[in-house]
């Protein structure tokens, strides 16, 4: 059903694919031949931007991929990191670490508590903060018990 492929590889034009596979140069899906086989085609090359913006996923599937059709779509991955970041962080590892760090930093800045025991006006309370606080307290209690046990065993 799906073939993995790199985004940098050449992808044929929609008209070329239809003319090669069906002999039809019209890429319209409204023709009577609904058993077209598109091998190695990307969905974004097949579906128009207008339809992507206007239709939901079920409508897109029924319009472009009828149940009686046979389609082989390619799976592709595109690098969405800006060129400036690629220049600073050339390896994939460094880029992933940067993305992870900045997302955690954004979360901390969004959900942090201010220094004076009241919440700042711009801080959005996290719905999980109470759960995290309870778990942190339980973990601290368990660690305290382990340290007490360690002291008892060390003195014995």
From Swiss-Prot:
User: Can you name a GO cellular component term?
Assistant: host cell nucleus
Record keywords: RNA-binding included? no
Q: Which InterPro entries match?
A: Herpes_TT2
* Alphabetic keyword roster: Host nucleus, Viral genome packaging, Viral release from host cell
According to the record, the signal peptide region is: none
Q: Carries keyword S-adenosyl-L-methionine?
A: no
GO annotations under biological process?
viral DNA genome packaging
Compositional bias (Polar residues): 19-37
Localization: Host nucleus
Please report a single Pfam family linked to this protein.
Herpes_UL33
Extract the ranges annotated as region (Disordered).
Answer: 1-37
What family is this? Belongs to the herpesviridae TRM2 protein family.
Q: Which HAMAP family match?
A: HSV_TRM2
Self-association state and partner proteins as the record states: Associates with TRM1 and TRM3 to form the tripartite terminase complex.
Biological role stated in the UniProt entry = Component of the molecular motor that translocates viral genomic DNA in empty capsid during DNA packaging. Forms a tripartite terminase complex together with TRM1 and TRM3 in the host cytoplasm. Once the complex reaches the host nucleus, it interacts with the capsid portal vertex. This portal forms a ring in which genomic DNA is translocated into the capsid.
Q: What is this protein called?
A: Tripartite terminase subunit 2
């Amino acid at each position: 059903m799906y073939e993995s492929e790199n985004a940098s590889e050449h992808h044929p034009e929609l008209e070329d694919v239809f003319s090669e596979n069906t002999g039809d140069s019209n890429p319209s899906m409204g023709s009577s031949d609904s058993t077209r086989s598109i091998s190695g085609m990307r969905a974004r090359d097949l579906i128009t931007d207008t339809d992507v913006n206007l239709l939901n996923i079920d409508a897109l599937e029924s319009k472009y991929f009828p149940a009686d059709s046979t389609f082989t779509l390619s799976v592709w991955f595109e690098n969405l990191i800006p060129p400036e970041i690629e220049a600073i962080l050339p390896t994939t590892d460094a880029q992933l670490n940067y993305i992870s760090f900045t997302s955690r930093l954004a979360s901390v800045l969004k959900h942090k508590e201010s220094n004076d025991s009241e919440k700042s006006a711009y801080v959005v309370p996290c719905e999980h903060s109470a759960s995290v606080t309870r778990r942190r307290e339980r973990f601290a209690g368990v660690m305290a018990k382990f340290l007490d046990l360690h002291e008892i065993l060390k003195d014995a």
